[in-house]
């Protein structure tokens, strides 16, 4: 994490101090939450829609903060060491940008409509075999989270893996202005946040903002929109590699499915690669990892070991055993592309019974009802044995799948419980706001009672 003095920070931000006699006060790390402040931290009071972090300075001091940012329009200034700034959020971002420029690590930037968190976890598992590596924790991938991730990097980090999310035009451009990625990966371009972008081509245009900030880009090439947007953006000095159905650099051969993972072949690896995660799409996510690893001279044995020992982030195709059943917790988010991929993964698991537990996909715009119905039709075509749905929009999914719609999670949970004593695979998926992970928690608690 960042280790410096308040005077150095004030100088980097071209501002002044207040409330202190000693400008050499050392800080160790930062926090934007007064409840999580650690001794030696710099407290950064963010002003949100409902809460102003300035009101929690006393709590931050009690927990050990030694200094704080302070917005100049908040007078009087406290009798406490503060760094005066015009906007605490902008100052957080500017501090992260300055700190990133002081580091000598290789930065790998990862974005994509789907798969970026899985790819990030794979990169970390592989690169940790050779280098001191740090990665984005949780979902810290936006205009607040990415600066927090950067400021949590150690001075001697060798590889920084930074996940970058996107909700609006310009988001990737802004995050790259802080991260300055050396190697960039676009895992997919789908319909997530279609409501904000209007078209898949605009989503591609937003993701490809990364192209003007990087030295090397590896992208998942699945749609003609990519070609159209690539032709708009000058990228003559960028090394460009692609993978996927229309890719030209990395090609997957045979994929063998196991109950607890997959094995696949790749044109750039001498031996088959085994992974402790499920789904053909995870083999595709591994391709840019292989590319990036070879760029940094990681040998194939280390790549193979890293991909076989991945620690996945919770709620992203996380495998959980409850009773005799295998639960696939993919409850962090859902959109049409990721839902179809998740159903493909479910159907590929070698088990006698497959159950899809689905809830609403949000932010899809005016076609939301038909898109939910398409997921139900797809589940039916795959031959999923049971499709259980909850949520207003998921009524259309259940209807098209010839499945069952429940008016509450509790009634759905009661229908699921008997299956826990059988050899079956159960997929749980929905947009984050639907909190489908509660179903898994309740099933686990019931099993332990």
Spans of features found by a protein language model:
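ATP-dependent carboxylate/acyl-activation modules
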Residues: 110, 314-316, 433-439
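Phosphate-binding loop of NTP-binding sites
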Residues: 10-13, 91-217, 221, 227-237, ...
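Active-site beta-alpha connecting loops in nucleotide-dependent enzymes
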Residues: 50-51, 313, 331, 335-405, ...
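N-terminal leader/targeting and accessory segments in enzymes
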Residues: 1-94, 278, 349-351, 377-392, ...
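Peripheral docking tails and interdomain loops at the edges
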Residues: 405, 423-444
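Residue-level signal for inorganic ion chemistry
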Residues: 9, 41, 60, 95, ...
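Acidic, Mg2+-coordinating active-site environments of NTP-dependent enzymes
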Residues: 13, 73-78, 185-327, 351-352, ...
